[in-house]
């Protein structure tokens, strides 16, 4: 049996080479590499347990520069790693075959698309026996500190497992554009503010209207005065054209935003519908938890206040049969689709 400082490889062999590296404990496993194909069998990963911040910890700027250099990306902030796409390609680079890049959404912009990528990453971790729990719910929110902590751990994991073999990230993505996700604080709803004075139709009209004095009618207007209305009118037309272009861009942006919101709505509605069907299947078992879930699903907006919720619970205990009457309704009754 191995001693307290020894570890067993997946083959059952003693592996007495645990490394202590500035607060980072690295427990190596056996890695079998077939030259030419880089074929990995499951259980090959070198697990890294980061216990403290060391001098080797990279700054936010250095870590983003490293990600962009390795994967040929154009990320500008640590928060943009919340899509999970970069981690998926890192795993393909370290352990070819453990993840399918065709399934990775490199242009993910919505939270459920981020979750999809992290599910693929978690599956690849499981295949390679990576002993790391991915805090998906925190990462997909795009908060800086959560994403910085995870990428700093992943950098140490990468250094412990990378064998130095050349890797073409663009070719591996098979032509997929790896666009960085939108910044959490700069969503598509935050359209640029425009000056009402500079772009308003009345501003151009005010500039174009020539000043005239009542009662003074020049008998012979000069050529310069004749050219003035023409030039001011063309300037007004240009201002209007610019405004039309800006408004068209706003309409396009709002359409994209609406499509994203509708996708999220359909996604979460589908989840609620699945929960409803499960509750209906077990509704006849007189399960209190099922009835409570049904009450939450069918609760309308006016019944969601804290006070009325307590009153509803008291009525439920007094009249148990009233809870079962909600089974005839559907969760779709609380959704209004345009």
From Swiss-Prot:
InterPro entries tied to this protein: CH_dom, CH_dom_sf, EB1_C, EB1_C_sf, MAPRE
One of the GO BP terms on file: spindle assembly
Region (Disordered): 1-21, 171-241, 300-338
Domain Calponin-homology (CH): 57-159
Record-level Gene Ontology MF annotations: microtubule plus-end binding
Main location: cytoplasm
Keywords per UniProt: Cell cycle, Cell division, Cytoplasm, Cytoskeleton, Microtubule, Mitosis
Residue spans of biased composition, Basic and acidic residues class: 300-327
Coiled coil spans: none
Compositional bias per record (Low complexity), positions renumbered to this chain: 200-234, 328-338
Transmembrane parts of this sequence: none
Family: Belongs to the MAPRE family.
This protein's domain notes: The N-terminal domain may form a hydrophobic cleft involved in microtubule binding and the C-terminal may be involved in the formation of mutually exclusive complexes with APC and DCTN1.
Protein name: Microtubule-associated protein RP/EB family member 2
Species of provenance: Gallus gallus
Upper taxonomic lineage: Eukaryota, Metazoa, Chordata, Craniata, Vertebrata
């Amino acid at each position: 049996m191995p001693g307290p400082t020894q570890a067993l490889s997946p083959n059952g062999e003693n592996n007495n080479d645990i490394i202590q590296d500035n607060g980072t404990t690295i427990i190596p496993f056996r890695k079998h590499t077939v030259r030419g194909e880089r074929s990995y069998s499951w259980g090959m990963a070198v697990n890294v347990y980061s216990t403290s911040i060391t001098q080797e910890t990279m700054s936010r700027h250095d870590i983003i520069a490293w990600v962009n250099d390795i994967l040929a990306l154009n990320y500008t902030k640590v928060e943009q790693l919340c899509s999970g796409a970069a981690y998926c390609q890192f795993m393909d680079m370290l352990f070819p075959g453990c993840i399918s890049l065709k399934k990775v959404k490199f242009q993910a912009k919505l939270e459920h698309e981020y979750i999809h990528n992290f599910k693929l990453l978690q599956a690849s971790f499981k295949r390679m026996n990576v002993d790391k729990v991915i805090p998906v719910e925190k990462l997909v929110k795009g908060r800086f500190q959560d994403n910085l902590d995870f990428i700093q751990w992943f950098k140490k994991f990468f250094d412990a497992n990378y064998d130095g073999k050349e890797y073409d990230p663009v070719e591996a993505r098979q032509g997929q554009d790896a666009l960085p996700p939108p910044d959490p604080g700069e969503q598509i709803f935050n359209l640029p503010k425009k000056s009402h004075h500079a772009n308003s139709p009345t501003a151009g009209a005010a500039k174009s209207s020539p000043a005239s004095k009542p009662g003074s009618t020049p008998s012979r207007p000069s050529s310069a005065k004749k050219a003035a209305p023409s030039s001011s009118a063309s300037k007004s037309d240009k201002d209007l054209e610019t405004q039309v272009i800006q408004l068209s861009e706003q309409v396009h942006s709002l359409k994209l935003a609406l499509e994203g919101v509708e996708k999220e709505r359909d996604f979460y509605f589908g989840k609620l519908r699945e929960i409803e069907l499960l509750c209906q299947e077990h509704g006849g078992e007189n399960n209190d938890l099922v009835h409570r879930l049904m009450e939450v699903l069918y609760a309308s907006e006016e019944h969601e206040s804290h006070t009325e919720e307590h009153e509803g619970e008291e009525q439920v205990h007094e009249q148990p049969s009233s809870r079962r009457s909600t089974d005839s309704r559907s969760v779709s009754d609380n959704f209004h689709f345009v």
